[in-house]
């Protein structure tokens, strides 16, 4: 069993704001919203008209640049994979390549990685379009359709890119998937002999059907702000009405601190622990007690005292019930210390990147910790009077951070919290 700390030695992000780490951080600090009318999704028959859209992004410049920077054999594999992969899986694969470069991994070191992909139903639009062609043309679908409908195909493609022959698998817990994958990464390192783990919070190729289904649940912002997309995601604001879906992905490279130091690599943060609970209660209603238990478990398992915490990257999706339940859970788990914390809502700027969100927002939280500056929570024009904690409503704040929480709660009562600590 590995007893030493596990660190984040490489990261990558691709959101509608930027495909670079510092580009995303700068956009958040400037208060730029990623939310626009959908361009790549046909919204003519659905209520949901806005989101964070990467479906029409040109990936060719990044493909060429990354292929040239990677070790030659890996660059050649990336080019080969790009010729056959659909758009969203390729977007995820390019982010893995960026994380490998950020971690400074040689080809042989990357090949030692175990691969974990967070997500499920990642190819909704591809599947729906295939079903439509199948029905309209007597089975006229591509031979590769079923392969690229499998979420596990993305894990296999990451392994192929890296030349890794270790474990590669997909983990799903709805929008808590990313933190579950980080927990699995810790277990691979501590109990299963992994030298390093690559965790990909995979992009979801959202479909009109999927968006409409969320809208019918009453989960999406579809009423007041369709003509003002940048104002639609507004956690903790009095006028919030639901979340705004978005494309996006994030990657973390995890490895033992000693191995990272021996390579002379930078450690962005220590991943101390992850707490996980289930509500056994209701598919959509959030549960304060379950969330509080996840927070408490994460701190206990990570060996982090409540008093060390300075910052919470909140799940805060902009729903009327969920935003307040999360704050109540923080109070229940952290006691009076909750009043001394800074809390912000990355979804107010990015929208909700669904299965990828815990990894995407974990990367952003670590970037903020290293910058000693936290982004503001956008669109809080009338703070909900029930909010009694500091939710960074006034904009960015300077804040040294010793340790932070990254919350993610999924439909079905999946409650997760990851804890990161500054590396001294």
For the regions a language model picked out, list residue spans one by one.
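ACP-dependent fatty acid/polyketide chain-elongation machinery
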Residues: 1-78, 258-272, 363-378, 416, ...
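Structural signature of cysteine-dependent C-C bond-forming condensing enzymes
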Residues: 3, 102-118, 131-143, 159-168, ...
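Conserved small-residue
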Residues: 8-10, 28, 96, 115, ...
């Amino acid at each position: 069993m590995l007893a030493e700390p596990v660190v984040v030695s490489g990261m990558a992000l691709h959101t509608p704001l930027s495909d670079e780490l510092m580009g995303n951080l700068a956009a958040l600090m400037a208060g730029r919203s990623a939310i626009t009318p959908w361009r790549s999704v046909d919204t003519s028959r659905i209520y949901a008209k806005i989101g964070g859209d990467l479906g029409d992004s040109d990936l060719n410049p990044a493909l060429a640049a990354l292929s040239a920077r990677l070790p030659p054999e890996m660059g050649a594999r990336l080019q080969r994979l790009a010729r056959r992969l659909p758009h969203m899986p390729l977007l995820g694969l390019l982010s893995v390549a960026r994380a490998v470069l950020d971690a400074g991994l040689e080809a042989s070191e990357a090949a030692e990685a175990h691969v974990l992909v967070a997500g499920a139903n990642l190819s909704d639009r591809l599947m729906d379009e295939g079903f439509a062609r199948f029905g309209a043309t007597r089975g006229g679908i591509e031979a590769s359709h079923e392969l690229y409908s499998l979420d596990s195909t993305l894990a296999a493609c990451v392994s192929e890119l890296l030349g890794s022959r270790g474990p590669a698998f997909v983990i799903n817990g709805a929008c808590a998937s990313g933190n579950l994958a980080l927990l699995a990464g810790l277990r691979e390192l501590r109990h299963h002999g992994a030298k390093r783990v690559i965790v990909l919070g995979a992009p979801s190729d959202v479909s009109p059907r999927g968006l409409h289904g969320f809208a019918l649940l009453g989960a999406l912002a579809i009423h007041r702000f369709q003509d003002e997309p940048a104002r639609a995601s507004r956690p903790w604001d009095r006028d919030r009405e639901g979340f705004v879906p978005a494309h996006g992905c994030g990657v973390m490279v995890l490895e033992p601190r000693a191995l990272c130091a021996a390579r002379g690599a930078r450690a962005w943060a220590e991943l101390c622990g992850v707490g996980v609970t289930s509500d056994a209660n209701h598919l959509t209603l959030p549960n304060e007690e379950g969330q509080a238990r996840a927070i408490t478990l994460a701190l206990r398992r990570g060996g982090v005292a409540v008093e060390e915490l300075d910052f919470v990257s909140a799940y805060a999706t902009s729903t009327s019930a969920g935003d307040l339940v999360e704050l109540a859970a923080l109070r229940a788990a952290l006691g009076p210390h909750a009043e001394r914390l800074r809390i912000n809502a990355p979804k107010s700027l990015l929208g909700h990147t669904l299965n990828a969100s815990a990894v995407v927002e974990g990367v952003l939280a670590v970037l903020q910790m290293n910058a000693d500056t936290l982004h503001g929570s956008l669109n809080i024009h009338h703070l909900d009077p029930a909010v009694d904690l500091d939710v960074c409503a006034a904009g960015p704040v300077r804040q040294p951070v010793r340790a932070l929480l990254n919350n993610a709660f999924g439909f079905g009562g999946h409650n997760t919290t990851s804890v990161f600590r500054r590396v001294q």
